[in-house]
Amino acid sequence: MEERININVSATNYDQSSDGIRSILTKLEEMVHEENEFVITDSEFAFGWHFYIVSVNKVLVEKLANQIGESFQKLKGKGLEKKFLTWFSQQTQEKNLKAKLAIKEEMESSKYGIF
Protein backbone atom coordinates (compact mmCIF):
# COMPACT_ATOMS: atom_id res chain seq x y z
CA MET A 1 0.00 0.00 0.00
CA GLU A 2 1.30 3.43 -0.91
CA GLU A 3 2.16 5.88 1.83
CA ARG A 4 0.43 9.24 1.65
CA ILE A 5 0.80 12.63 3.27
CA ASN A 6 -2.62 13.98 4.22
CA ILE A 7 -2.93 17.74 4.54
CA ASN A 8 -5.91 19.51 6.06
CA VAL A 9 -6.83 22.64 4.15
CA SER A 10 -8.98 25.47 5.52
CA ALA A 11 -10.05 28.11 3.03
CA THR A 12 -12.76 30.71 2.59
CA ASN A 13 -13.06 30.00 -1.15
CA TYR A 14 -13.06 26.29 -2.05
CA ASP A 15 -13.09 26.68 -5.83
CA GLN A 16 -10.22 29.15 -5.94
CA SER A 17 -8.06 27.35 -3.38
CA SER A 18 -8.65 23.82 -4.70
CA ASP A 19 -8.01 24.94 -8.30
CA GLY A 20 -4.78 26.64 -7.21
CA ILE A 21 -3.67 23.61 -5.22
CA ARG A 22 -4.53 21.31 -8.14
CA SER A 23 -2.39 23.53 -10.40
CA ILE A 24 0.58 23.45 -7.98
CA LEU A 25 0.45 19.66 -7.61
CA THR A 26 -0.06 19.04 -11.35
CA LYS A 27 3.07 21.11 -12.08
CA LEU A 28 4.91 19.11 -9.42
CA GLU A 29 3.82 15.86 -11.09
CA GLU A 30 5.06 17.14 -14.46
CA MET A 31 8.35 18.21 -12.89
CA VAL A 32 9.06 14.73 -11.47
CA HIS A 33 7.37 12.76 -14.30
CA GLU A 34 4.49 11.27 -12.31
CA GLU A 35 0.71 11.18 -12.80
CA ASN A 36 -2.33 10.79 -10.56
CA GLU A 37 -0.34 11.06 -7.33
CA PHE A 38 -2.68 13.36 -5.39
CA VAL A 39 -6.35 13.57 -4.43
CA ILE A 40 -8.39 16.59 -3.31
CA THR A 41 -11.56 15.78 -1.38
CA ASP A 42 -14.85 17.66 -1.52
CA SER A 43 -15.19 20.35 1.11
CA GLU A 44 -17.26 20.57 4.24
CA PHE A 45 -18.51 24.08 4.93
CA ALA A 46 -18.74 25.43 8.48
CA PHE A 47 -18.49 28.89 10.07
CA GLY A 48 -17.69 30.56 6.74
CA TRP A 49 -14.79 28.19 5.99
CA HIS A 50 -14.34 25.24 3.65
CA PHE A 51 -12.45 22.30 5.14
CA TYR A 52 -10.99 19.59 2.92
CA ILE A 53 -8.07 17.20 2.59
CA VAL A 54 -5.29 17.00 0.03
CA SER A 55 -3.72 13.54 -0.02
CA VAL A 56 -0.32 13.31 -1.73
CA ASN A 57 1.60 10.13 -2.50
CA LYS A 58 4.89 10.14 -0.58
CA VAL A 59 6.74 9.02 -3.73
CA LEU A 60 5.89 12.39 -5.31
CA VAL A 61 7.36 14.22 -2.31
CA GLU A 62 10.48 12.03 -2.28
CA LYS A 63 11.06 12.76 -5.97
CA LEU A 64 10.63 16.50 -5.32
CA ALA A 65 13.19 16.28 -2.49
CA ASN A 66 15.65 14.45 -4.76
CA GLN A 67 15.13 16.82 -7.67
CA ILE A 68 15.57 20.12 -5.83
CA GLY A 69 18.13 18.60 -3.45
CA GLU A 70 19.86 20.99 -1.07
CA SER A 71 17.17 23.68 -1.25
CA PHE A 72 14.60 21.12 -0.06
CA GLN A 73 16.83 20.11 2.85
CA LYS A 74 17.14 23.77 3.90
CA LEU A 75 13.36 24.16 4.21
CA LYS A 76 11.94 24.68 7.69
CA GLY A 77 10.78 21.55 9.48
CA LYS A 78 12.02 18.17 10.64
CA GLY A 79 11.51 15.29 8.28
CA LEU A 80 10.09 14.90 4.80
CA GLU A 81 6.46 15.73 5.66
CA LYS A 82 7.22 18.99 7.50
CA LYS A 83 9.61 20.18 4.80
CA PHE A 84 7.00 19.38 2.13
CA LEU A 85 4.38 21.31 4.10
CA THR A 86 6.74 24.31 4.17
CA TRP A 87 7.38 24.02 0.41
CA PHE A 88 3.65 23.57 -0.30
CA SER A 89 2.74 26.56 1.91
CA GLN A 90 5.26 28.71 0.04
CA GLN A 91 3.71 27.66 -3.27
CA THR A 92 0.20 28.55 -2.11
CA GLN A 93 1.41 31.95 -0.85
CA GLU A 94 3.07 32.67 -4.20
CA LYS A 95 -0.27 31.99 -5.90
CA ASN A 96 -1.94 34.27 -3.35
CA LEU A 97 -4.26 31.47 -2.20
CA LYS A 98 -5.98 32.24 1.05
CA ALA A 99 -5.66 28.81 2.62
CA LYS A 100 -4.24 27.37 5.84
CA LEU A 101 -2.43 24.03 5.63
CA ALA A 102 -1.62 21.48 8.34
CA ILE A 103 -0.54 17.84 8.42
CA LYS A 104 -3.72 15.88 9.15
CA GLU A 105 -2.18 13.44 11.64
CA GLU A 106 -0.85 16.32 13.75
CA MET A 107 -4.26 17.97 13.88
CA GLU A 108 -5.68 14.78 15.35
CA SER A 109 -2.95 14.25 17.94
CA SER A 110 -3.54 14.94 21.61
CA LYS A 111 -0.98 17.76 21.40
CA TYR A 112 -3.72 19.92 19.88
CA GLY A 113 -6.55 18.64 22.05
CA ILE A 114 -9.14 15.97 21.54
CA PHE A 115 -10.95 15.89 18.20
Which residue ranges define each predicted feature?
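Short amphipathic alpha-helix segments
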Residues: T12-F38
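Short glycine-/aliphatic-rich beta-strand segments at the starts of folded cytosolic domains
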Residues: M1-S17
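A structural detector for beta-sheet-dominated domains
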Residues: N8-T12, T41, S55-N57, L85, ...
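Broad gene-expression machinery/nucleic-acid interaction feature
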Residues: R4-N6, F51, K98
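Classical N-terminal secretory signal peptides
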Residues: M1, G113-F115
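Extended Gly/Ser/Thr-rich low-complexity repeat segments
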Residues: D19-L28, E62-K82
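Conserved short beta-strand edge segments in small beta-sheet-based binding/regulatory domains
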Residues: E70-G113
